[in-house]
Amino acid sequence: EVSSIAMSGFYGQSFLERANYKDLVQDCLHAMKVMNAKVAFLPLGGIKAGWEKIPALRTEVVKRLKEVGDMAASEGVVIGIETQLDAKGDVKLLKEINSPGIKIYFKFQNALENGRDLCKELKILGKKRICQIHCTDTDGVTLPYNERLDMNKVKKTLDKMGWSGWLVVERSRDKDDVRNVKKNYGTNIKYLKEVFQ
């Protein structure tokens, strides 16, 4: 089973500036069909910071996300977007997009790095707006040793919300042993299973 297909090229390239964005998303939708994945991951990190405050740029982002969201919805799948906005900003953006094919792919790291209350952010978004979660933080320590991420509190919050789904481990590597993939991911997965299962 495949959790999601990532369009990670959009971390480095701007979804706003690519003329062929629909073709790129369509390629992802084809891959999803082949892999039987129900979620695509679309990070908006490649867009120049501050786009959400410039009306012309925001309008174009909303238009493009509505188009690709409707493409996804017509195939019975969802595109999960990652933004740097807070939860209220994400809710507002989703309302503007107004497509059942666009939801939030929530990343713990964004809330934590910006000093936001992670559990409060989850509650504001609510279970219906979150398609998947990057259960990860900045590299430094693995999840069991992360002092700013209370995973038990996160579990209680998600349970209270009634949310269930994929928790995708992306980073949270030991900074002194970042290349040891087996150790880092093995440690994180073991810990998540202890907390969530």
What are these regions (language model features)?
Residues S4, Y11-I104, A111-E113, K183:
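Active-site acidic/histidine proton-transfer and metal-coordination neighborhood
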Residues S74, A87-Q197:
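Histidine-acidic metal/acid-base catalytic patches
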Residues G9-Q13, G46-G50, T138-V141, R173-D176:
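A short, flexible beta-alpha/helix-coil linker loop
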